[in-house]
Amino acid sequence: MKFNNKVAIVTGGGRDIGRQVSLKLAAEGAKVVVNYANDAASAEETLRLIEAAGGTAVLHRADVTTPEGVDGLVSAAQAAFGPGVDILVNTAGGMVARKPLLEIDDAFYDSVMDVNFRSTFLTTRAVVPHMSSGAAIVNFASQAGRDGGGPGASLYAVSKAAVMTFTRAMAKELGPKGIRVNALCCGMISTRFHDDFTKPEVRQAVANGTPLRREGRPEEAADVAVFLASDAAGFMTGANVDVNGGTYFS
C-alpha cells in the first residue's frame, strides 16, 4: 500500500471531494483524520465507509478558519496516531454566496477569504512543524483562481488565486526540508457546491464547453490529489494542476 501507516489530515474531509480523498487515502493504508465543520452526518458516513473497507480513521470537528480550531485538529491527530503528520490535504472551502462587487461588504469579504484562504494558511502553519522530509501538502485551488470565476464569484476567485500563490510560495520555502506542496485547480465537478451555487443551465453549458462534454466526478479530483500526495509525484512541487476536462482547449 502506497501510504501504509502514514498519517493524513483531510480538512473538509467528510463529503464530496474531501470524502473521496479520505476514502482513497485510507484504502491505500493511511491513518486518516477526517475533519469537518458542520455536517456530522456526512462525516460519520465517511468514517463508516472507511471502516467497512478495513481502513483506519477518526473524525474531528473543527473550524479551521480559527487558530484554536486548527490547533485542536493537530492535537486530535497526535492523540490518535502519534506526533508526526505525513500528508495534509486542504479541501475545506466554499463559495458562501454569489455577489457582485458593490454588494460585497466587509463581513462577506472576511467570510469568503476565511473559508478558502485563511483555512489553508492556518492549517498549513499548524501542521508543518510536525512534518518531516517526504511529507506532502495538497491544496485545493480552483479554475476560478486562473480565470476570475463566473458571475458573482470574483471574491471566491481571488481567494482561490491566493491559494495558488501560497502553494508556490510554500513549495519554495518548504522544499529544502523535503516537504512538497501542490494544488488542484478544479473546474466543474459534480458536488453540492454547484448544486447550491450554479444554475442547471449554466452547468450544462459549461460541461458542453469542455472537450470531454461532461462534469468531473469527485473521485476523479480525489485521484489527482492522492497522486500528488504519493511518492509517485516525488519530483512535483509548486504545481497548480488543472482538473477541468480540458476547458482551456475549447
Please give the residue ranges for each predicted region.
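Substrate-binding pocket helix/loop in short-chain dehydrogenase/reductase
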Residues: 99-101, 105-113, 194, 206
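A conserved structural motif in NAD(P)-dependent oxidoreductases
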Residues: 210-221, 232
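Short C-terminal tail/terminal secondary-structure segment
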Residues: 98, 226, 237-250
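Conserved glycine-rich cofactor-binding loop
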Residues: 7, 14-16
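Alpha-helical segment proximal to the catalytic Tyr-Lys
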Residues: 129, 172-176, 234
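Active-site helix of classical SDR
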Residues: 124, 159, 167
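Residue(s) in the substrate-gating loop at a strand-loop-helix junction
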Residues: 142
